[in-house]
Amino acid sequence: MAKVYFRNENCFDVMKKMAEAKYTVDLVLTSPPYATSRSNVRTQKAIDTYNSRYDICLDNMNEDEYVEWTVKLFNDFDKILEKDGVVLYNISYGSENPNAMWRSISAIIEKTPFMIADCIIWKKKSALPNNVAHNKLTRITEFVYVICRKNEFKTFRCNKKVKNVREDTGQKYYENVFNFVEAPNNDGACKLNKATYSSDLCLWLLDLYADNESTVFDPFMGTGTTGIACERFCDDSTMTCIGCELSEKQVEFSKERLKRYRAEHQDSIEIPFDDDED
């Protein structure tokens, strides 16, 4: 059974506590807000419809704000990520502001200690047809960026298995693992969080970049999908998963979801970097 902790707290505050306590994680696995909400639609009803992806977050930063926010996020990751740790960053571009994603990825490379080591294409099982835009295709894929520190590009962990070793040189040959995965959009509809993100996808990623003793951090836990994936990872796993979420409703939903999965409730308990005031 994994140790799963849900924190109803801003991830930047939690990472500050971690850094001060010198508490580190092996893997960051997350799907951040995409800054996809629309402010240029004509009616209030349309605004309410488009901007209801999450129950409390409008997700409506402009491009410059989003890039600055992303840079701060990754500089904070650098303070808590173990040596040779990896960030798995599921993100896609918005219909109204597609530049925001590309600019934020560029800023990660240029303004933080990190680089893009790989890019995985996630094909979702279904997608809403794009019947209202004359020049945009129906998007059925998203990206998962594999991000490591620039000075750890040759050493960051990945669980590809060795298939053969050349006797005369010792050269290792690894199994083929393609940078393409098909997984469900989500684990079921939830009105609190309409973002696409599934535990099947997370589990596939954990198999590649984690082990039974890994500590996994999700700064945008939402409805607990990363936590469920860590629980599914291995029945006898000692994996730890720490998730942050601003929405109290989503945190409570996550606890109940984990309770249903385990058939017994595990309350969120104090974690090693917590202070006495919580």
Predicted regions and their residues:
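Core catalytic lobe of class I
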Residues: 2-253
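S-adenosyl-L-methionine
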Residues: 1-17, 255-278
